[in-house]
């Protein structure tokens, strides 16, 4: 959140669409009144609303008669459960039949001008061949396949090939360590892992196959490894009998493989997210409801049309890439960007050169990137961006000053800005403006999407707070199609995390306010999760990595405000007797986090001190947050602490840590 006062009254009307321009399609939604009418129907009669939308946007092998059953309260909701559908047919085949030469994937390689376009006809052939290769490796209906790949077209081809077989993909972000890869592979008992010899990002070459080789020493379920050669010359260490080069096996298979037909509640993919216990949770998204949520939000939030070119600069290792690089755009038959590089390579104009080169119509990035480019200066925003209609922000609340720069400088005051709020577990947007019609308030996610019965709950009583101009915890009262159904092999964990805190509601974990106009403002996490550059990490996960070092007796991790990344990790460390805080020890502790989770999780500061504990032994992170924020006068009641005097020691330790050079 911004440290400056927020103007809750500033309203920016959505830009007027250029009428009479044949290159600009008619908006998918006409007015704010139409949104209000559709929203009311989606809440009051969800079966009719979502049933009509599913029939309109999806091709069914067997029509459903029941739209939704079950409830949030019982964690048993299901959508279109008596129907049957082929997800890959919906994503690829039907567009390859209707518009075979339309562009499906826009590959922007790390080095500018080295990418390529892939049509829907070509995508169907490549996906079919990859599916055939995986089938020859023993992959079939319901099997799990891991993907640890760079942002290249073959990654999306692999995802779709797995889906084509009715198997379940588990994409692992290519910045995770070998230990993190092994944890995810073992939890889901993957049969095959797909990787590349290396990735290219920001002019650097990063080995991937070596990480996989190390991980697989602990992964007994993996039988085959499919390896794409991203380097000019093969560099990977291959294991005979287990590892297969992509270029050796893929061409051997036919360019058409029949797509699997599945029940709409069949798992489409697993995606691991941070858990409060430190063990990542395999969030399960199911086919019918998830695909509908992805398609509907793309259609109405981004005003995406089949002739559009969607630009999302995310990574498929996270939910943003799943929903708004792969599944949403392809469901609508649009072209979608596969961006391998960084916003600063070779310079800070890279994003805007991509927009100009490919004539992108939507642009979707995180506030971290927006802040980075805002700092770099307006001189880099020099490319033709006239093709853009809707800008989007994702991952964390966007500060009003960054919103205004995005709107005024990047969008030239003619593009709507959608500040989208959602989570891995929600599958698609839950609070957001609809690009063509919603008046914008810088800093606010605005209004609930269709079917999202959003409520503000009093955290003390657990009761709904009615009316506007209220603050509390954000929760959802009714099922929606794209919601995760469970945690892989851990339904009790799903219930404990999302449903038990406030029975009868889905708990988002975020605090929120609803202003006098009914607009929702996200205030940040109320549970033990940090948000770094839009990526959520459990504090327990980082603490466990620190505790793996022999010197650490206890640790407590908190997130602190950071102008660039949103939050940064600060770690409080209590050392075992006989150990001293040295520069060398600090390096070892940071390396422990890097090697266990990944470099992006590294603590910004290590603070060596005792910890504020209650008499029952619970660490009071609230006190640590207040001290780090310089709000010592707002710490409040210390009577529950076992030793209130420890607070003074922590204040001195924080002061000392701040004096040290970073």
UniProtKB/Swiss-Prot annotation:
Group of enzyme by EC: ligase
Entry EC no(s): 6.2.1.1
Catalysed conversion reaction: acetate + ATP + CoA = acetyl-CoA + AMP + diphosphate
InterPro entries hit by this protein: Ac_CoA_lig, ACAS_N, AMP-bd_C, AMP-bd_C_sf, AMP-binding_CS, AMP-dep_synth/lig_dom, ANL_N_sf
The entry's keywords: ATP-binding, Ligase, Nucleotide-binding, Phosphoprotein
Residues at which ATP binds: 395-397, 419-424, 510, 525, 536
A GO CC term attached to the entry: nucleus
Binding site for CoA: 201-204, 320, 533, 594
UniProt keyword Ligase present: yes
GO molecular function (one): acetate-CoA ligase activity
Single Gene Ontology BP annotation: acetyl-CoA biosynthetic process from acetate
Keyword ATP-binding assigned: yes
Cross-referenced PROSITE patterns: AMP_BINDING
Record-listed Phosphothreonine modification sites: 596
Family as reported in the entry's similarity comment: Belongs to the ATP-dependent AMP-binding enzyme family.
Protein name in UniProt: Probable acetyl-coenzyme A synthetase
Organism classification: Eukaryota, Fungi, Dikarya, Ascomycota, Taphrinomycotina
